[in-house]
Amino acid sequence: MRTIALLLAYDGTDFAGSQWQTDIRTVQGAIEAAWEALTQEQRRIVLAGRTDAGVHASGQVAHVQTATRHSLATIWRGLNAHLPTDVTVQNVGEAVRDFHARYSAIEREYRYLIDCAPVPLPQLRHQALHYAGTLDVTAMATALKLLEGTHDFAAFTTATPSQRSTVRTMYWTRIVERVWFDRRLLAIELAANAFLQHMVRMIVGTLLLVGRGRMTVDQFGEVLAGRDRRLAGPTAPAHGLTLTAVRYPPGLIRWVEPLERQQGATKVEQPSSYVHEE
């Protein structure tokens, strides 16, 4: 048996979340159907993280235990040929035998996108939350920094504290301002060892209260310390959220190089320099 790792990207708009559900369209279900069509194997695909309906991914990771002898390049091309257009396999890799997409992960990264233009852009309606009002980004960034380190994030989850630990370690946070098509976009980015259910969306919803002047930075800190969901702001809509990366200790996965995928897994040496002349 082999353990194959998959790097996935998907538009979550038309999926009822990532995790398999009976008779409902999910990311896991789409990948398992494509895998069976390619290999004639019925295998369970294991995802690194669960995403809700409407949430996107550009760096989701999955693994599958398989007996197939297909090359990695064939798996990459074959899965993409069988998958719908709103989910793709960006890369494939050979993983160590005991690799687990979820339990081997040491870091997850998310980005929440806010479109701050006066009028929404239709092309962004499924990828960014539109907010036309004024936001105090400095106050939002200051409040966001309070989350870094190891804390009990019970105030920012719908999970029942008695069911599981709500302590997580936030490695870093930042708010990046970008201009795209003459529009001002805010990207709220967070990295942690793991995230709780709805955690990022609840953090963003509370940060928006800070940005709008309806909550102070100190009050935001009190929400975190209070560990009470009722103190936090509303849950931000799902469509602005993207899982951007899942990270692992080195040596667990040998990802295929881009040229190997293009050349059918034949290694091609890249030139040391490249000059393009018109």
Swiss-Prot record:
InterPro entries, per the entry: PsdUridine_synth_cat_dom_sf, PsdUridine_synth_TruA, PsdUridine_synth_TruA_a/b_dom, PsdUridine_synth_TruA_C, TruA/RsuA/RluB/E/F_N
Gene3D superfamilies hit by this protein: Pseudouridine synthase I, catalytic domain, C-terminal subdomain, Pseudouridine synthase I, catalytic domain, N-terminal subdomain
Segments passing through the bilayer: none
Reactions catalysed according to its record: uridine(38/39/40) in tRNA = pseudouridine(38/39/40) in tRNA
Active site (catalytic residues): 52 (nucleophile)
Highest rank taxon of the organism: Bacteria
Keywords: Isomerase, tRNA processing
Leader sequence residues: none
Pfam name, any one: PseudoU_synth_1
The protein's Enzyme Commission number: 5.4.99.12
A GO term, aspect molecular function: tRNA pseudouridine(38-40) synthase activity
GO BP annotation list: tRNA pseudouridine synthesis
Binding site for substrate: 110
Family, similarity comment: Belongs to the tRNA pseudouridine synthase TruA family.
Self-association state and partner proteins as the record states: Homodimer.
Role noted for this protein: Formation of pseudouridine at positions 38, 39 and 40 in the anticodon stem and loop of transfer RNAs.
Name of the protein described by the UniProt record: tRNA pseudouridine synthase A
The species this protein was found in: Chloroflexus aggregans (strain MD-66 / DSM 9485)
Phylogenetic placement of the source organism: Bacteria, Bacillati, Chloroflexota, Chloroflexia, Chloroflexales
